[in-house]
Amino acid sequence: MKSFGLIALAICGVICVAAEPQHTYDGRNGPHVFGSPGNQVYIRGQNEGTYSVPGVGGQFQNAPQRGEHVYTDEAGNTFVNRKNAGGPASHTISGPNFSAKNLGPNGAKSVGIPQRARRSPQFHVERPGRTVDVGNGGFYIQRGRRSPQLHVARPDRTVTIGNGGVYIQRSRRSPQFHVERPDRTVDFGNGGFSAQRFRRGINDARVQGENFVARDDQAGIWDNNVSVWKRPDGRTVTIDRNGHTIVSGRGRPAQHY
């Protein structure tokens, strides 16, 4: 019975060892630097062969036989770190976007970046009245010829200035002068002046009764003893039956006449 238990325990141990998953690099076991062209690339993981890192796109490959650790990102760029047994480590970056090599302290460093298209040595600026061209031979300015004619126009005259001098042309004014007001018009011309007054309508602003009258901003009222008139300037004029006048209002003391 005891031997059966030992056998069962051994079988379970073998199964557990076989079922233990392969460790993957999670960033806690060493540097994980990719960088930009010219910066050090150093990758280290636990697994041998190809593996992936959770949360990081691309693929890793650890090749201890070659002493290389390779990372290829999602864009196809490859970062290689070489241990170089017996010497300093080196790294290489290559891909569609850039390339760089660092062969160690004793080696030269080269960086290759896609070359930018060569710019034209010609620089051209254009304005309405001139053009400027700058190149290897210096700069060239070309000014367009301005018109010698200057023209100014007003409602009753025009002024033209050119090579021949100044020319002013005044249009003839009408001999008729016209003034119009709500209740009248006045026309003045060669034949004299004519004034025309219009009859006020029954809907005029004036209101009048037996003992009062009001129009716009003034009004008056009266009886047998006194009459009171409110003037447009805000003053009040009072006249009694004996002809005495009192003017008051607008913050001034009453004035007796």
Swiss-Prot record:
Modifications the protein undergoes after translation, according to the UniProt entry: Proteolytically cleaved.
Keyword annotations: Antimicrobial, Cleavage on pair of basic residues, Fungicide, Glycoprotein, Immunity, Innate immunity, Pyrrolidone carboxylic acid, Secreted, Signal
Residues linked to a glycan: 97, 225
GO BP, one annotated term: response to bacterium
Observed effect of gene inactivation: Viable with no obvious morphological defects, however flies have an increased susceptibility to entomopathogenic fungi. Displays increased fungal load 48 hours after infection with B.bassiana R444 spores resulting in a significant decrease in survival. Survival is also slightly decreased following septic injury with M.rileyi PHP1705. Some adult males display an erect wing phenotype upon infection with Gram-positive bacteria, fungi, and to a lesser extent, Gram-negative bacteria and clean injury.
Signal sequence bounds: 1-19
Keyword Transferase: no
Region Disordered, annotated ranges: 95-122
Coiled coil regions in record: none
Task performed by this protein: Secreted immune-induced peptides induced by Toll signaling. Has a significant role in resistance to infection by the entomopathogenic fungus B.bassiana R444 and weak antifungal activity against M.rileyi PHP1705. In adult males, activity appears to be important for neuromuscular processes that mediate correct wing posture upon Toll activation.
Name of protein: Baramicin A2
Lineage: Eukaryota, Metazoa, Ecdysozoa, Arthropoda, Hexapoda
